[in-house]
Amino acid sequence: MTLSDKEIIVKDLTFRYKEQKDRNAIEGINLEVEKGEFIVIMGPSGAGKSTLAQCLNGLIPHFTKGHYSGEVVVRGIKVKETPVSKMAKEIGLVFQDFEAQLFSTNTKLEIAFGPENFGVPREEIEEIIRRVLKIVNLEGLEDRPPSTLSGGQKQRLAIGSVLACMPSILCMDEPTTDLDPIGKIGVFNIARELHEEKELTLIIIEHETEEALNADRIILMEKGKIIKDGKPREVLKEVDLMEKIGLMPLQIPKYFSQVSNLEKADLPLTYEEGVQKFKELGLQIDEGKYQEILRREDEREKSYGDVIIQAKDVEYVYSNGTKALDGINLEIREGEFIALLGHNGSGKTTLAKHFNCLLKPTRGSVIVYGKDTKNSNVYEIGNYVGYAFQNPDHQIFADTVYDEIAFGPRMRGCTEEEVKERVAEALKAVDMEGFEKEDPFALSKGERQRIAVASILAARPKVIILDEPTTGLDYKEQKRMMELVKRLNESGHTIIMITHTMWIVAEYAHKVAVMRDGKIEMYGKVRDVFKEEERLLELSLKPPSIVSLSNRLGKTFLSVEEMVSCTKR
């Protein structure tokens, strides 16, 4: 066999980062990839997925140093002996933090950067720009600075800038992290079309399981090792294995594995297959138990307190003339847990920033605990409303966890004794006691996210706004974060959460407001809104598959557990 028989060959690859003395990031990896294959690599945070990706194009070991052994051969080229600049022609890598990849002053120049550096003639570059803009659906945005694009557009631009180098292999590291459900499908559709049309070899690293169905192969990684490599229809039925390693299993096979004695091979994977299997097995929904769930929901509705936040005819226009909010009317009652949903750029974050006075309406009014925000400031409203940003690193700045959490109470003039009490209380709430002396930036993303929440709790607000609290976290970390949020809500905090993760909305939120183009298009209890599946799709949203399955059976269940509890076998 010559070196170039396979598109990628990885032999006995082990790598340990300099700073990790006691643990290999990847260990004993053996992998072969055929030309034109579409592979999805999945695993929890810290499994070694991104490390493996960076070994494929030579960033490791050429830029990132550490202990490296084994061999990687890409299209017949030994990666360890080849500069990254040469490897970039063979394999393109779209980073997990795609914004870090964008630096040009407009979209066109961003796409041209790679070909220019490879000495491609100007006329050809013009043609490449045209072709790439069409592929990634950014036509008409040639002159827009990347900083003015939405998250989804930036993501597509990062993919386009890599495609412009015309690599034979495209590797994307968690390309859909910040995207709404339809945006995610869009990125996977682009990837699939490229794969089919251009015989491109495609490697996608993902936490999300739903879209992996379309791949040729799925590779599961855990603790730096490959633990499963097979066809999607085989791997995605491994419900127990996926839960064990910290990945979210598909909801449909999980449901049927709990309500039937089906062999793994016979488990349905999609809601369409699920409807058929439900009927085949003669399963039924217990009407009495379903009505009990609805009754408990009605009881909860009656338990909320007074209206504490009120938006009346709110409009907001940014300084560049963009109207971000257009006639918003919304009331939030004490004790509610409301999710703000909508496609990227629909106005969710702009609206949330009005609730703690970070922004003030251009027209209309926002009343928070009886105070008109037009006559208030962040400091005053901050006594009532705390805001955790999407990226915890935009919020964290202190050298120790203790000082980070103590900052708010100290600014409010608390005595050191009271500061100590509040820090202890906040750390207990987020389950991070004992971390007081740690450097926040040395913690994992999930831990930093919890520290950001703790620093808000220390100010003892009544309302907590969470902007994408689970972005970049794996399933186990997401569950842990959301159980914390649920506890905060149950202890009396009102929660306002912005998210794209639909299963989290289904399982944790009470109410939902769906936004598009600065307007609230749908509002109500989560179950009532998720019934309206066609309307949600029009608004770039897609409910979890267990909701889609149950809707087609005449009921709306919000979680696998809920549906299992009402299934008569």
Swiss-Prot record:
GO cellular component terms listed in the entry, alphabetical order: ATP-binding cassette (ABC) transporter complex
Domain ABC transporter, residue spans: 8-248, 309-542
Gene3D superfamilies xrefs: P-loop containing nucleotide triphosphate hydrolases
Cellular compartment(s): Cell membrane
Signal peptide positions (record): none
Residues annotated to bind ATP 2: G342, H343, N344, G345, S346, G347, K348, T349
UniProt keyword rRNA processing, yes or no: no
InterPro entries: AAA+_ATPase, ABC_transporter-like_ATP-bd, ABC_transporter-like_CS, ABC_transpr_CbiO/EcfA_su, ECF_ABC_transporter_ATP-bd, P-loop_NTPase
Membrane topology, from the record: Peripheral membrane protein
Pfam families in the record: ABC_tran (PF00005)
Positions of ATP 1 binding: G43, P44, S45, G46, A47, G48, K49, S50
Domain of life of the native organism: Bacteria
Location, primary (coarse class): membrane
GO molecular function, one term: ATP binding
CDD domains in alphabetical order: ABC_cobalt_CbiO_domain1
Keywords: ATP-binding, Cell membrane, Membrane, Nucleotide-binding, Repeat, Translocase, Transport
EC number: 7.-.-.-
PANTHER family to which the protein is assigned, alphabetical: ENERGY-COUPLING FACTOR TRANSPORTER ATP-BINDING PROTEIN ECFA1, HEAVY METAL TRANSPORTER
Database matches in NCBIfam families: PRK13648.1
Function: Probably part of an ABC transporter complex. Responsible for energy coupling to the transport system.
Homology family: Belongs to the ABC transporter superfamily.
Name the record gives this protein: Putative ABC transporter ATP-binding protein TTE1589
Protein species of origin: Caldanaerobacter subterraneus subsp. tengcongensis (strain DSM 15242 / JCM 11007 / NBRC 100824 / MB4)
